[in-house]
């Protein structure tokens, strides 16, 4: 507001999603000069296209980035150097409310206490790499790009040119599983090093 305070305009802006949000990334995926948002959730993710007037439109289905599992993080980056932002979405684990496991620990008094189960109690799920088609849609290129790994329990992805060769590489932080460092081969594929 210009006075050191913020005003909640999520409803007016059209981003008042009622899901269980776990992460968000920002990037201009359609090259119109306005920053768009990708929201990851325990449940359906949402891609919000910035309309340039202070509002956003949900274009998740038309953009073909509608994951419905437990996604925990995402990151925009131009891995194929074609001038538009691609999208990597990390997925946490194969967890369903109706299949919830009960986990217990024994406290110092010898009593069993119910706790949230750690990540290793659940099988991991594969993350997804979406290539931007340049027309407002994306294609899932996870397997052919070499980043398919079903055991991940992905938390947070980050694009960076760690080897300084002119193309961005991908680091994925995981829970209860080793992290992934995918080196960009410069031809649309990656190698997990």
How would you describe each model-predicted region?
Residues 1-193:
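Acidic, glycine/proline-rich Ca2+-coordinating loop motifs
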């Amino acid at each position: 507001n210009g006075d050191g305070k913020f005003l909640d305009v999520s409803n007016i802006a059209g981003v008042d999603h009622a899901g269980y949000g776990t992460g968000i990334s920002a990037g201009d995926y359609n090259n119109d000069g306005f920053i768009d948002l990708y929201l990851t959730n325990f449940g359906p993710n949402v891609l919000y296209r910035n309309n340039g007037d202070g509002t956003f439109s949900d274009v998740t289905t038309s953009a073909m980035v509608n994951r419905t599992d437990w996604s925990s993080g995402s990151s925009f980056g131009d891995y194929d150097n074609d001038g538009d932002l691609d999208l990597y979405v990390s997925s946490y684990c194969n967890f369903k409310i109706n299949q919830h496991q009960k986990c217990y620990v024994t406290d110092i008094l010898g009593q069993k206490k119910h706790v949230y189960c750690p990540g290793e109690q659940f099988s991991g799920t594969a993350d997804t790499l979406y290539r931007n088609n340049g027309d407002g849609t994306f294609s899932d290129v996870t397997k052919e790009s070499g980043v398919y790994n079903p055991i991940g329990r992905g938390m947070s992805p980050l694009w960076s040119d760690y080897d300084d060769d002119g193309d961005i590489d991908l680091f994925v932080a995981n829970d209860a599983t080793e992290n992934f460092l995918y080196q960009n081969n410069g031809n649309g594929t990656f190698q997990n090093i």
